[in-house]
Amino acid sequence: LMKKFRVKHGSNEPAAYAVCALKKLKIEPKENEKIYYGVFDFGGGTTDFDFGIWKNSEDEDMFDYELEHFGAGGDIHLGGENILKELAYKVFSDNTPELRKRKIQYVRPEWCPELSGEEILVEYTREAKLNTRKLGEEKLRDIWEEKETERIDNVLVNLFNADGSLETGIDLKINEEELKALIKDKIEKGIKNFFIKMEDAFKDEDVKKVHIFLAGNSCRHSFVNEIFEKYVAEMKDKMELVIYDLKAIKEIDKENDSKITGKTGVAYGLIYSRKGGRIKVTNRDEKENMANEVNFKFYVGNNRRNKFNCVISPNSNYNEYKFFGIVKSDIFELYYSTSPEAQTNEMKSSEAKIKRVNLKKDYDDEEERYRIYLKADKSDKLTYAIVKEEKDIETKKLVEEGEISLN
């Protein structure tokens, strides 16, 4: 039996969900019509975006439909469980005097900036991780899942101190309005990035209408529909947005025992788009980068007046040098981010990560203007090259060359 067992690369999850939703909702393309779609997959760990075109297959003997998807992106930090971690961090940060007195430590999420005075409180020990999990799971999940019926001003929680002993009945103040504002801000930023990425994905298309499918259990939050409806109103003169939330998808098969959900929708989509099926799924990004399975993962740039100035993006071609700037010493700094907002050149540079690259020699010579170029080599790797004149990058007359890893 195992000799017949095969594992094959199929559609990604958002594309598979789109296949299922388009088929189940009976969104039928007319002859030569392109139907544009987007998927906002807001899960527990991350949020994924996917965009594409649904159309009738040109080869009717082989397929009924073709789905071409492209412009995939997302937010690796926007997810229900990550929001819980950030809520816990916010509550801990608002109660530092009590925590310091009891020697209680907690975890700061990697995407949150360091706050002054928390040096001895933030740790990554087993106890610190347990404290963050306990506060989030036991006391803050109801706020995130909108289950609380009465206002919460404080919680009593048992936490571990730095010595590993359990401290009982710790009274932590909670500002529920601030926690809800944090949730809304996180979701709003994620949806803003979705639309930035959508405009970029469809920039070469004449788009009048887009079907948007909300997937992932975190899309149940009321702020998600509220913010998407705001975009529907704001963009009505530009294009029509049709939003399908989880409830709309579930209603498709309400009489069927095997109802469509965020998870089963992906499974059905993978079945519909399997090899030998009647739906052909193609990934434009993979076709354009035949030697590389995925696009470059980051937005890379420099700091211009405290704004992120984008030089390389996930749309950039591999092995194509881009001018980065003038090098002035034996070190240069680059900024990088996974947020689609980075491509607008309006994002604060402080919201990106910074990478300092040590060079092989010092270029502190005001009479010579050495130019530095960057190119993407792999999904998370760059090469830099330093030249004296612009023409030298074409002739490969390099003064210095090196690799940069963004892992």
Language model features with spans:
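Conserved phosphate-binding/catalytic loops in two-lobed NTP-binding clefts
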Residues: 1-12, 229-267
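Gly/Thr-rich phosphate-binding beta-strand-loop-beta motif of the actin/hexokinase/Hsp70
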Residues: 25-68, 214, 270
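Phosphate/oxyanion-binding active-site loops and adjacent basic polyanion-contact surfaces
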Residues: 10-17, 42-45, 79-87, 172-194, ...
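Nucleotide/phosphate-binding catalytic cleft detector across ATP-hydrolyzing
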Residues: 1-38
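Acidic low-complexity intrinsically disordered segments
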Residues: 165-181, 185, 273-407
